[in-house]
Amino acid sequence: DEIGDAAKKLGDASYAFAKEVDCNNGIFLQAPGKFQPLEALKXIXKHXV
């Protein structure tokens, strides 16, 4: 089905990146702080352009 095909494509494309993430890094244990949607969108737009 289309969803399964898309999921496989996404998994294949992201696997190399996901392997490089150190899940034992202490940063993942820290609280993210106050979420600011506008600031998040600015950061995403800055990296996407």
From Swiss-Prot:
Protein location: Plastid, Chloroplast
What would you give as a GO molecular function for this chain, any one? chlorophyll binding
Q: Which SUPFAM superfamilies match?
A: Peridinin-chlorophyll protein
**What keywords are annotated for this sequence in UniProt?**
Chlorophyll, Chloroplast, Chromophore, Light-harvesting polypeptide, Plastid
Q: Which InterPro entries does the entry link to?
A: Peridinin-chlorophyll-bd_prot, Peridinin-chlorophyll-bd_sf
Question: Posttranslational modification, per the record?
Answer: Binds 12 peridinin and 2 chlorophyll a molecules per monomer.
Specify whether Plastid is a keyword of the entry: yes
Its primary localisation, in coarse terms, equals plastid
Extract the Pfam families matched here.
Answer: PCP
Per the record, its GO cellular-component terms are: chloroplast; light-harvesting complex
> Is Chloroplast there in the keyword field?
yes
Role this protein plays: Water-soluble antenna for capture of solar energy in the blue-green range. Peridinin is an asymmetric carotenoid.
Fill in the subunit field for this protein: Monomer.
What is the protein named? Peridinin-chlorophyll a-binding protein
